[in-house]
Every structure is written in C-alpha cells, then in structure tokens.
Regions:
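Histidine/acidic residue-rich metal-binding segments in metalloenzymes
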Residues: 156-161, 224-250, 257-358, 372-390, ...
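Alpha-helical scaffold segments that flank or form the walls of functional sites
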Residues: 42, 63-185, 226-244
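Mid-to-C-terminal alpha-helical segments outside catalytic/metal-binding sites
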Residues: 28-47, 56, 61, 70-127, ...
Length: 467
C-alpha cells in the first residue's frame, strides 16, 4: 500500500511538472524598464552616420504608372534590403498596382521571419497605420495610393526624417556621383567616397562622373604620371574638406579582397597608365593596394576618418580581420568598420579592443539580423568602451530611413534593458550609452558636425559642452 501511495505521489509530481514545464522567457520589451529606455532613446536627435539619400528630384526606384513615374509600395521594397535577399516581383512596365499586387502578394510568405522584411513593418505601422503582416488587397491599394501622393513633393520626406525619425544630421555617401559634395537637405552632410579613386590606374577604368582625370582637367590639372594622379587626389581631398565633408568611405569589399599589401610606390608607378587591355589582374591589385595605403595616410593628414565596408557582400574576402596589418601600421588614422563586420561581429570587437583608432558602426546590422545586432551591442559593450560605437540607417527613401532608425532604437533599447535587468548595468548608464551610440559618439569623432547642428536647443547644448 505504501509503495502504491509513493508511486501515486511520484506520478502526480510528474504531471504537475509536465503541466507547468519551464517558464517561458519574459520579453523585456513588455516591461516598464524597456519602455523607459526606449522613450529616452526616441527623444535623442540622432546622428545617422550613413545614408544614400539623393536630391528629391533624383529619387531612385520610381515605377511607371498611369500618373507617370511614381514612388510606389513596390518602390519601398525595391529600395530596401528586402529585394536583395527575398523574392520580389518586378513592376511590369506600364502595369497597374493591382496587376503587380496579384503577382507580388505571395512574395512575402517565406520572408515573414527575416529581419530584412520585419524592419520595414514599423514604417507601415507608424507612418500609415497599416499592419503589413495581415494586409488585404484593398488595404494594399490604399497604402500604395498614399505613398504615391506623399512623394509629389519633398515635404513628406523631410518631415519623416526630421520629425518622425528624429534625425538631426545624416552623412550621405553619394555613390552615384562620388566627387560632388553638394548638400541636398538641411540635415545632409557630405562624405568623400574614395572607392573609384583607388581603381584609377588608367582613365578608361573610371566613369567620367567619378574620374580624378576628368575632375583634374576641369581645373587645368593634367595627369600623365602617378605623381600627377596623386596631386589631383590631394586636391580632391582638399575640396572635400572645404565643402565640409567629414569622412571617407570605401566599398571596395564588394569588388575585391580587403587584404591590402603595402606595395612600394615604384611598383605602382610602373603599373600606372597601362590600359585595361594591358594591365594584369595582379598588377591592378598592386595599384589598388598602394592606393588604399596612400588614401589611409591621407585620411590622417586631412583628419577625415575612414569608413570601410566590411562583411556582408563579397564574403570570401571581406572579413575585417584582413585589415589588421593596415590598421596596426596606421595608428594616426581613425578607422570605422561598417556593418559591425557582419557576420564577424566578434572579430570586429576584438580588433576594436586592441586598437584604439578603430570604431564600430552598426549600420545595416539590425536590418540583416535583429538578433545578431542585439547580441553584438551587448558583446561590444563588454569588450570595448562605449564611446566607439555608432549607427546608421543606410537606405534611400523616407520609409526605409524611418524603419531602419526605429528598429535600431528598439534593438539598442532591448540590448541595454536586458543588461540592466540582469544587474550588469545601471539604468542611468544605459541611457547615457544609448545617447552616445545614437548621437554623441558621432559628434565626438566628426567635430565639424557640431557647427552644422540646426536644432537650436541641441546646438546650444553641444556648444556649451565644447567650452
């Protein structure tokens, strides 16, 4: 009898344990702690360190509609990272929205969990009041009509960037015209993209719009030798500084390996001037290696920190670890490793830990993988000082900018709230760190930004802090 009673008690215990099971992990986003941190970060007028926002009259991804070229719902996805990872039906030439939606409405089913899809949802939710996960054909048509109407002039774009996304300044990389430094908006700050400069072993290598040869000839500077070429490049740097450009940007990781050898000047001079038909791939790489080291030294000379695309793209040659020799040999140059080196976020942190002239920019990371971005923020803060981490949205229109900004603020707030909840950080320090990443670190790294601030209360506050 006693044995049967013990068995019964044991069985009941198993039932109770099975019924209760392990408690599900609490979602920090449902807590007052997260709400306080998120509200604090939302109030920070952000400095966005990387955008590709064109002048309004040159907006990309417009579709042919019965009302003429227009920004459409398709345009929003086509101008985002969604289309590079997931299926997106093309907009048929001259088609109506209904024709496109009939083909495209099923495109999103296999992407529902991807960050490249989910990061856009806050834009539809907050700017248009639409739950895109459950959108109907009628709602999609209405959403499309509202998007088309919003882009009849630039008022919507400016309002979303400055008020809804709460961005005060953004650094604009004009990859469509790398040697122009015009400011299309009050909030835009020019960047000198040096990607094509480093390829210019011969004038036929470059499009006219990006050519130091064409730029020099317009200023009576002829290029016959490597010395001539470098003299024009130095003038371009000086022009960028005069136009208030605050940094350099390289996207060579899309084209080639990030391993740059310290090639002697003489070897580059021997290669210079060879036509594309004559030069070998090895010789072209030697020239680019020399130029990358030269541009790195110019970065220090002109006090233009160097943003370098690392990670996602041409993965077989884009690990930030390949830059270590260059970084170590150039301690006066301030390097900014873009995208956190995704997927090598840990390696990127190790580089920054060992080299105080390295900053990490989380630009793009939350839209590639929200979970990895949250983990990266927490790991980076454990490995390196909080004053060398930044962020950027890296998009091309209002909805993408808002979405990337909102998801970054949320991801950062979640990462910080979890650390506070675990007792690893005081809430007051979490708020300060959040502001550093969203704003203060960029102002410290790019000091010229302080005189470009246009919100009077923040400009006054920063001026007072500088005195």
């Amino acid at each position: 009898m006693l044995c049967r009673f013990a068995s019964l008690v044991g069985a009941l215990g198993c039932v109770i344990v099975a019924a209760v099971g392990p408690a599900p992990a609490a979602d920090i986003k449902a807590t007052p702690l997260f709400a306080r941190i998120k509200a604090s970060l939302d109030a920070v007028p952000a400095i966005d360190t990387h955008e590709h926002l064109r002048p309004f009259g040159e907006m990309p991804n417009l579709d042919a509609t019965d009302r003429g070229p227009a920004m459409t719902l398709h345009s929003i996805f086509a101008g985002s990272y969604y289309g590079g990872i997931n299926r997106l039906s093309r907009w048929p030439q001259g088609a109506s929205f209904d024709q496109w939606w009939a083909a495209a409405s099923g495109d999103f089913d296999n992407a529902r969990a991807t960050s490249s899809y989910r990061y856009l949802l806050p834009a539809f939710r907050d700017l248009y009041g639409v739950d895109f996960d459950t959108i109907t054909a009628e709602q999609a048509r209405e959403l499309n009509d509202r998007i088309v109407a919003n882009y009849q002039d630039d008022k919507w774009l400016i309002d979303v960037v400055t008020r809804r996304a709460n961005i005060e300044l953004m650094l604009v990389d004009p990859y469509w015209s790398r040697l122009q430094f015009a400011r299309a908006y009050q909030f835009s700050v020019p960047v000198l993209n040096v990607t094509e400069i480093m390829r210019g072993s011969h004038r036929e290598k470059l499009a006219d719009v990006d050519s130091p040869y064409v730029w020099g000839e317009a200023r009576d500077m002829k290029i016959s030798t490597l010395d001539d070429y470098l003299a024009v490049v130095e003038k371009i740097f000086a022009a960028a500084v005069a136009a208030d450009a605050v940094c350099l940007k390289s996207t060579q990781a899309y084209q080639r390996t990030l391993r740059y050898e310290n090639v002697p000047r003489q070897r580059a001079a021997e290669v210079f001037g060879k036509s594309p038909a004559e030069i070998t791939p090895a010789e072209q790489q030697d020239f680019e290696d020399f130029m990358f080291w030269h541009v790195t030294s110019m970065s220090a000379k002109f006090e233009l920190p160097f943003q370098i695309h690392t990670g996602h793209g041409r993965l077989q040659g884009s690990s930030p670890m390949m830059l270590l020799d260059l970084i170590q040999a150039n301690p006066q140059t301030k390097f900014i490793l873009f995208h956190g080196g995704f997927p090598w976020v840990g390696e990127t942190a190790a580089i920054a830990m060992r080299h105080r002239n390295v900053w990490i920019d989380s630009v793009w990371l939350p839209t590639l993988s929200y979970t990895m971005a949250k983990r990266a923020y927490q790991e980076w803060l454990e490995i390196m000082p909080s004053d060398r981490i930044m962020w950027g949205a890296d998009t091309v229109q209002a909805e993408g900018i808002y979405a990337a900004t909102e998801v970054t603020r949320q991801c950062l707030a979640e990462a910080l709230a979890e650390k506070v909840d675990r007792g690893e950080l005081r809430e007051a320090d979490a708020l300060r760190i959040g502001r550093q990443i969203l704003r203060d670190n960029a102002l410290a790294l790019f000091p010229k930004l302080k005189r470009q601030l246009w919100r009077k209360d923040e400009a006054t506050k920063n001026a007072a802090g500088a005195n």
